[in-house]
Design a protein with these regions (language model features):
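Secretory targeting and sorting signals
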Residues: 1-32
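C-terminal subregion of chymotrypsin/trypsin-like serine protease catalytic domains
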Residues: 2, 64-78, 90, 203-256
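Conserved catalytic-core segment of clan PA serine endopeptidases
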Residues: 33-42, 53-54, 85-136
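Conserved hydrophobic/aromatic beta-strand scaffold that supports enzyme active sites
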Residues: 46, 69-71, 126-130, 173-175, ...
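Active-site-proximal beta-strand/loop segments in catalytic clefts of secreted hydrolases
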Residues: 49-52, 65-67, 73-76, 100-103, ...
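Chymotrypsin/trypsin-fold serine protease catalytic domain
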Residues: 104-118, 122-194, 208, 223, ...
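Trp/Gly-enriched beta-strand/coil motifs that build multi-repeat beta-propeller-like domains
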Residues: 256-615
Length: 615
């Protein structure tokens, strides 16, 4: 892949390798092996990037600069025949996998994570690549805050070719001397090393006073001494990173993941939508989150308001969002089930409540915690007024393990006393045969008795006619839950993994129903499709699902988070969707809110009420 610079020589090229490659060529051409193999468990922030598949496969190197971000060269992702920069923001055009913290690629250490999003610079060969999930057990590298100077020695890392290997399997390192520093680039010459194909995006490190700092990333090289190259010049060009710290910090702090909930947060009788965003990490490495409210109006939803944020210390990936009127004051609040870590007595989980003030939310209050023995990762949370006292409670479907008769699940209820939550009570359990990982949980008053119940959309397996899903209802008796009843099932053709579930009274008869936003896949023309099904309650069971809407244009199920509420204040609940609509060139996520207004027997076509970047 050629770097888009004025032509200097046919050897001066970009460094993304056109095949899976591994090591950096860093030594004299006279030696048998160019470059030093890196000792295991050092430079664990280094990442090997595998981009594309088959004949289009290429490889690059990068650096973990945040638990969920890799800094590398944008030329790695540029399409054939296109400039190295700028490249389009958003999802990579080719499937990209990052291997972080694995010195030997044939080993098993480190983490292997898919890259899901690119945030490029427009002025240089540089891009931030977002990982599908945070890598929390590997320390990111810090960025140098001053430019490399003439004569300075930098240590370069990479997984690219060596003098003798086209496809090495380990990280290599070697020295380079700085010869000049420009506005966005650094010129270097070999001082015991050579940069080869597959090293693009790899780090050039400043090592001094016991610190390792990222000073630049590899962009282009003459490739002297590299396998398959007859070049003799040892020059290379690096992309500066010392002057983009503010940009890297901004990207790290951009809203990433989101969780949605609905409720009447300002008490005006019209339900609203809340979005809980992952704001990455601060410059000091602290995790940040924010809470936005989309308040409903007579004409729809306006621009979201940031109603709470933290400069650090609250981790989105350890949070499960739910909502309800926990104080009984007529305004819905937000609750977060939080992974607090572990103690000598086991895993610790806590409940935080963001109490509504009507105009916003108070700072979160820890309204319940355990000293150990309650595992967040085994919990699925929902809310409802299960005892009918006018205050919503929290329920957790819990993975209790296994028994001789199969997988064991339990329901725990955290009853609100208006200020905090009582310790959880096990209000239902099974001796075996109910699998937590096959369950999606929701709440509603399905029999109309004034007490909310719990429903589970369950993956029942397969039949000759396709995938089988079922609905189970756990009816509240005010104190505990009755054993679950199968209130609907299909003989095949309804896929659990393609379903997102929510509850509401869509026909206004006083009994809550269930809705499923369903993934219809991709059409023959490449258009993403979705559908909406409603399961109407008759007070005892649910009617067979009715397909009340199917997308006619592009509607991406993976980008959708459905919630329910009476958004138009007509006495019938509607469906709302918080939808990720794209990414701005500077990496900010673009969200929109859709509502599917209930007609009593179906829903109207979705209406887009607001769309814009989340800051």
């Amino acid at each position: 892949m050629h770097l888009r610079r004025p032509l200097r020589s046919r050897f001066f090229v970009g460094l993304a390798a056109a095949s899976a490659v591994g090591a950096l060529t860093l030594s004299s051409p006279a030696t048998a092996v160019i470059g030093d193999g890196v000792t295991d468990d050092t430079y664990t922030f280094a990442a090997h990037l595998s981009i594309g598949e088959g004949d289009a496969k290429r490889a690059c190197t990068g650096s973990l600069v945040d638990a969920q971000w890799i800094l590398t060269a944008s030329s790695c992702f540029a399409a054939a025949g296109q400039p190295a920069y700028p490249i389009p923001a958003g999802a990579p055009a080719l499937k990209t996998t990052a291997t972080i913290g694995r010195t030997h690629l044939t080993g098993t250490g480190g983490q292997v994570v898919e890259v899901t999003e690119l945030v490029p610079r427009s002025d240089r060969d540089l891009v931030m690549a977002k990982l599908a999930r945070p890598v929390t057990d590997i320390a990111p590298v810090l960025l140098a805050d001053s430019a490399p100077v003439d004569g300075e020695s930098l240590r370069a890392l990479g997984y690219g070719r060596t003098a003798t290997a086209w496809v090495p399997d380990r990280l290599h390192a070697g020295a380079f001397a700085v010869t000049a520093t420009g506005a966005t680039t650094v010129a270097v010459t070999r001082d015991g090393g050579t940069i080869c194909k597959g090293d693009a995006g790899g780090p050039a490190l400043r090592e001094q006073d016991g610190k390792v700092l990222l000073a630049a990333v590899h962009s282009a090289s003459w490739q002297a001494g590299c396998f398959g190259s007859d070049a003799t010049r040892g020059d290379a060009v690096e992309t500066r990173t010392d002057d983009v710290i503010e940009w890297v910090t901004q990207v790290r702090g951009l809203p990433q993941g989101s969780q949605a909930a609905s409720g009447d947060f300002n008490g005006d009788g019209r339900e609203d939508i809340a979005a809980f965003y992952d704001n990455g990490t601060s410059t000091t490495g602290k995790n940040r989150v924010s809470l936005f409210a989309f308040y409903g109006t007579a004409s729809g939803f306006g621009e979201p308001e940031k109603v709470w944020s933290t400069p650090g210390g609250f981790t989105w990936s350890k949070s499960q969002l739910t909502s309800g009127d926990y104080t009984g004051d007529g305004k819905d609040d937000i609750a977060v089930l939080y992974d607090t870590g572990s103690s000598e007595t086991g895993n610790i989980t806590s409940l935080y409540t963001f109490a509504s003030t009507g105009a916003g939310f108070r700072a979160p209050q820890k309204t319940w915690t355990t000293t150990g023995g309650f595992t967040w990762s085994k919990s699925k949370v929902t809310s409802g007024d299960y005892n009918g006292d006018g205050k919503d409670d929290v329920a957790v479907l819990y993975n209790t393990g296994t028994s001789d008769t199969g997988n064991v699940s339990s329901l725990y209820t955290f009853t609100s006393n208006g200020t905090t939550f009582d310790n959880p009570r096990k209000t239902w359990t099974t001796t075996g045969g109910f699998t937590w990982s096959k369950s999606k949980v929701t709440s509603g008053d399905y029999n109309g008795d004034g007490k909310d119940d719990v429903a589970v959309l369950y993956n029942t397996g397969t039949s000759d006619t396709g995938n089988v899903s079922s609905l189970y209802t756990f009816t509240s008796n005010g104190t505990t839950f009755d054993n679950p009843r199968k209130t609907w099932t299909t003989t095949g053709g309804f896929t659990w993994s393609k379903s997102k579930v929510t509850s509401g009274d869509y026909n206004g008869d006083g009994k809550d129903d269930v809705a499923v936003l369903y993934n219809r896949g991709t059409s023959e023309t490449g258009v993403r499709q979705a559908a909406l099904f409603t399961f109407t309650s008759n007070g005892t069971d649910f009617a067979a699902p009715k397909e009340v809407w199917t997308s006619t244009g592009s509607f991406t199920w993976e980008a959708s988070q459905p919630v329910s509420g009476d958004f138009d204040k007509d006495g019938k609940d509607d469906i709302g969707v918080l939808y990720r609509a794209g990414t701005t060139p500077d990496g900010r996520r673009i969200d929109t809110v859709f509502t599917f207004s209930s007609t009593g027997t179906g829903v109207k076509a979705p209406v887009k009420h607001w769309m814009g970047p989340i800051i």
